[in-house]
Amino acid sequence: MISVIIPTFNEEENIAQCLVSLSHQSLPRSEYEIIVVDGGSKDATCEIAQKYADLVFTQTSKKVGGARNDGVMAAKGEIIATTDADCILPPHWLKKIAEDFLDPSVVQVYGPVYPIEEGIGNQFSLFLANMFSRIGYYSKTFFYTLGCNTAFRKNAFIRAGMYRCIDAGDDLEIAMRMKDTGAILFDNGLKVGFSMRRYEKFGAVQSIYEWIAIVSDGGESGKYSYSRKDYK
């Protein structure tokens, strides 16, 4: 079984389209579960999620990494897939993940993203992000495993120490520990629709700058707005 984990916080405007896309996967519904881990939403996020998800509960650990960790510990599946509440998953997303893990040496897979919103600027921003992912993977210097489009073996993830509860870079950091447990695979066909709302609100350059600054400082945000929960 594959367990899909989605952290949420005040996502009533986005969570339905994400969960609908997950409900229309080519993988049989009996072969995966949907887990929504909420960060204390004040809107109708949980009510909407309960219409589609197998399990909805409030996180007890801190930050997005902690929410994913909580989801992993509640998961029934031996394979864990993670995405974000504002993403759209193509119909064959879970089937691709299942196929990638037929190789017993693989402990984690990840793939590229494409913008949900239109615009040349959005396309260019994610072109650069995907290029960054490929450079890291093929050079074997780092693995830019975005939390919106990655999957891993539960046992290997737990052995690696799980996500750090930091503001940014937890998905990049965990991969450096996961590689010590087995092979990490970048699958060009494992694509996810990614919302550009953060970039459109704060600006692409500012968002990227803040992400780099936070990661360089060990993952703690402090003065930066990049990882705050109160943006819509």
PLM ranges: what are they?
Residues P115-N122, S133-F152:
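A recurrent flexible, glycine/aromatic-enriched loop bordering the glycosyltransferase active site
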Residues M1-S3, E33, E173:
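Cell-envelope/extracellular polymer assembly enzymes that use nucleotide-activated donors
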Residues E11-Q25:
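Short, well-formed alpha-helical segments that are part of the catalytic scaffolds
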